[in-house]
Structure formats: C-alpha cells, structure tokens
C-alpha cells in the first residue's frame, strides 16, 4: 500500500528533515486528509521540535500551525506536543514577518482551535492575532477570495457534527 510506504519513508527520513521539509509534510497530510500513523507521527513531531526553534521561518510556522489545526479539527487527530511549540515561535514573531497568506493561515488555525472543533481553547496566542491576522483574513474575504474547500469543510463540521447553525459568508459591503 502506497500510504504505508510514505509513512515508512517519513520514519526513515525524519532525522534529516529541516524545518521546511517538516512543515511541508504536515501540509501534505492536512491537504490529503490523512493522519500520520503512530511511528510517522512521532517521527514528524520529533523533526518539527528539532528544527522549529532554529530554522522555522514565518511560512513554516504558519503552514505547520494551520496543518496541525486542520488535522485536529477535520480529522480528529489529537494535537501533538509540537503544536504548542510552533505557536510559541509564532508568539515570538512579529506580524510583519508574515505575508498575508501566512497571517490568514494563523487566524484560521486560531479560529479552529479557539472554537474547539475537537480541542477547545487551551493555547496562548500572539497578542496581534486578533488585530493584524484577523485584518488579513477579513481583507481576503472583502477581496472576494473564494472560500477554500477546507473553509467549507469546517463549516460543515460546525453544522453537522456540532449542530451549530453556520454558513460560509462573504463580506459584500466595504
């Protein structure tokens, strides 16, 4: 099975992963909707923890935080220990270090965790998340950026699993 081969490759290659490789692996899992298996999860967390402090740039931080939040929120994966470590790095950064896409990812991750699709709000967030990151998120909406399939899927989880009345909206006034 191809997925088993991928998971074995993660376990074997995790020791040599840099920050970008670890971030990309989390993103690949999140966008494919597949959870890493036990050994691959441990190896990927280890690679993330090893490389995070020295080498994570703003893109790696935003991608990793969003990917882990999406896996938890949409697939029920318990948040691994490295999730809080990556948020700590984000707290130490300034919003100007992130492109708007990264700020949007951080705010999206914040919303997924804050509103507790699977974990509730237990984290500490950068003080600027409510201002600059939310502003980037709202700008994306105002510019009529199409809702991603993940945004629609999260709305579906709120609606179907949490029995909450919600829909994906788009701001139509300035």
Predicted feature descriptions by range:
Residues 1-174:
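Eukaryotic RNA-binding helical-repeat scaffolds
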């Amino acid at each position: 099975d191809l997925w088993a081969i991928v998971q074995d490759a993660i376990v074997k290659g995790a020791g040599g992963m840099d920050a970008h490789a670890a971030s990309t692996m989390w993103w690949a899992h999140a966008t494919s909707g597949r959870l890493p298996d036990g050994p691959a999860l441990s190896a990927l967390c280890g690679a993330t923890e090893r490389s995070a402090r020295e080498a994570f740039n703003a893109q790696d931080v935003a991608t990793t935080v969003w990917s882990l939040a999406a896996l938890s929120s949409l697939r029920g994966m318990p948040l691994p220990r490295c999730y809080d470590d990556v948020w700590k790095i984000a707290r130490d950064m300034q919003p100007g270090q992130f492109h708007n896409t990264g700020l949007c990812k951080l705010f999206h991750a914040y919303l997924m965790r804050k509103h507790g699709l699977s974990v509730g709000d237990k984290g500490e967030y950068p003080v600027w998340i409510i201002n600059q990151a939310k502003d980037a998120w709202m700008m994306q909406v105002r510019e009529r950026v199409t809702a991603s399939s993940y945004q629609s899927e999260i709305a579906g989880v709120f609606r179907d699993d949490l029995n909450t009345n919600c829909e994906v909206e788009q701001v139509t006034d300035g």
